[in-house]
Amino acid sequence: MIRVAINGYGRIGRSILRALYESGKRQQIQIVAINELAKPEAICHLTQYDTTHGRFKHTVKLNGDQLLIGDDSILLLNQPDANLLPWAELDIDIVYEATGSLIDRQACEAHIHAGAKQVLISHPSSADVDETIVYGVNHDLLRAEHTVISNASCTTNCIVPVIDVLDKHFEVKSGAITTIHSAMNDQQVIDAYHDDLRRTRAAGQSIIPVDTKLARGIERILPHMKDKFEAISVRVPTINVTAIDLSVTLEKKVNIEQINSVLQRASNGSFNGILGYTDEPLVSCDFNHDPRSSIVDGTQTRVSAGHLVKLLLWCDNEWGFANRMLDTSLAMIQAKLDR
């Protein structure tokens, strides 16, 4: 049994906990503690009730500093300094670092100094971590000695498996990406101040361009793709599910049927459970609560002049990513067992 703690109990932190209870992995992973600065009453309430993912199927209660989920008891902590967290006392194997504020090795090593054995970051990190993992593509790089690991981003997890499949079959020469991302909690409900002037504007009223480092994230996972991709991102007035418009130029000449066939086979084969494929006329809300990293919409595949391919990919940017956090943490422990 892996003993884990969640540091930061926001959208991803809560999704990790809920995903664990729905995924069938509770015999392998135990959430021992949650460190969150919000009030315990709010933590309990938002665990039970969620606008995006619905009501939690398990009963959630508070008992002092314990969050009770069914027969499970999880210690609630309220410690802003990661160096002072009781990870040694609690014998924590892995900390899910989900605050969004600890993004480099030095900051995350506070958890190691506090007694945790490993840290898995739930967002892109600086380059000095031991590895950045997209589960299903490069989790075989995990080693027993690794202590600080990034699980990349939801969009990196969405797009990299598709690029990997296309490259192995048809050789990707270059690509351009537009991420059509649901609104996030770093945006405003109504106009308010923000360092990013575009994010001063009401999230529910505009399509808002934001900066993205997705292209650099692809390079970190697939180093041979360096300088081959560029990306832009816009936020749209939906609360969950993201679409990615991917255009790639391929070395080999292809048609729509070949592209869709290769991706569909991958979804049923080596990427089963990670990559999906659909040819139904679906919309974004149909992918809410989907545990896969990426779903190819085969109805939107286009090929121009035999080499330029356009794809539409879907992902639940919360739920799919939370499930990959669970998968990667199990792979981290397996790497130790394989030592």
Swiss-Prot record:
It is found in: Cytoplasm. NAD(+) binds at residues 11-12, 317. Catalyzes the NAD-dependent conversion of D-erythrose 4-phosphate to 4-phosphoerythronate. The active site is at 154 (nucleophile). GO terms for cellular component: cytoplasm. HAMAP family: E4P_dehydrog. Its EC number is 1.2.1.72. It is an enzyme of class 1 (oxidoreductase). One of its GO terms (molecular function) is erythrose-4-phosphate dehydrogenase activity. Belongs to the glyceraldehyde-3-phosphate dehydrogenase family. Epd subfamily. It comes from Shewanella frigidimarina (strain NCIMB 400). Substrate binds at residues 153-155, 199, 212-213, 235. The keyword Metal-binding does not apply. Homotetramer. The gene is epd. Pathway: Cofactor biosynthesis; pyridoxine 5'-phosphate biosynthesis; pyridoxine 5'-phosphate from D-erythrose 4-phosphate: step 1/5. Keywords: Cytoplasm, NAD, Oxidoreductase, Pyridoxine biosynthesis. GO terms for biological process: pyridoxal phosphate biosynthetic process; pyridoxine biosynthetic process. This is D-erythrose-4-phosphate dehydrogenase. The record marks 181 as: Activates thiol group during catalysis. It comes from the Bacteria. It catalyses: D-erythrose 4-phosphate + NAD(+) + H2O = 4-phospho-D-erythronate + NADH + 2 H(+).
